[in-house]
């Protein structure tokens, strides 16, 4: 009977014995394989005497046999003991003498046994949002600005104009790298320049030359400029004002075949806003549930699972780097470790919620989710059919729905309060 020993944390160790006769039988089987293909001078292929095969290939046959026997015996034990393994085990052979029992140790990690607690202590604030006509008006204004043209103006520049400037910056009378440009087009009001720069341009007209005194922020990205006072000599070459398109049928038609009137456009916008709002609210509530679960349930996680998650995050980083997996692989482990650990913890907690509540993906919710996704496309029926025929996509959606149901299970026990909020507060929380 093998005794499983706890070494540290979630690491376990067990000593396993393989009977000598089983080992020798496995070695003989390996030798048969070598005998079939062995080429030895003076003998035909497959006709080499057994003692010569054993002499030449005995060591290799024994290694191959153990490579098969060790994991087989370990996983038989893991199945029998119902071990919830995390990652692959490592083996160390203690005795492998010919004719004797083979004794080896397996070191491995297991997933923790999660016992959910403190659900009633989790506090969740659910925003209650109504999309108003003013919200729709604001969205239409955004669309108009996206389609805007620019007209040259002789008026003084203001915070919503576009200006073309030449500038040359100095610090203590000396020019610095990156501080000079010609025909630089600046969209005012977007905060692209350091504080005080745009404000210094406002009120000036095309053709004017003037100086601006500014100070680089203490956290500026260029080390040599942090916190430094600078003077910029400006030549304002052009001021342009934004010209918004009228809400005509021609303008409305740009936003899809189903938008023929302003009323149609407003309906489409409101529909999209409702979908975006629903996703944002779901995400916000889920994040609060996750934060609450982690605060109430401190659980150890196996290093192997964290390592696997780090590789997933590195892969995602590679996608952001344009598929450069070599560059992503060089990113330090520390960059991903905390996020990876958190993701493993969340996965374990959600897994326990799903298991303890015997949850299964609600197919009606899956269907509704597909229809919601499809409604954003011009041919929703084709999108629905595409999802229904793609098992991988369907399983991904079922997992999303299952997580939503797990969140619902927590909300049923948590302290939930409602708070009225505006559409803009939810969609632009950093604004």
From Swiss-Prot:
Coiled coil start-end: none
Span of domain PPIase FKBP-type: 160-245
Pfam families: FKBP_C, Trigger_C, Trigger_N
Cell compartment(s), UniProt: Cytoplasm
EC number: 5.2.1.8
The reaction(s) this protein catalyses: [protein]-peptidylproline (omega=180) = [protein]-peptidylproline (omega=0)
Domain writeup: Consists of 3 domains; the N-terminus binds the ribosome, the middle domain has PPIase activity, while the C-terminus has intrinsic chaperone activity on its own.
Similarity-based family: Belongs to the FKBP-type PPIase family. Tig subfamily.
Protein name, as recorded: Trigger factor
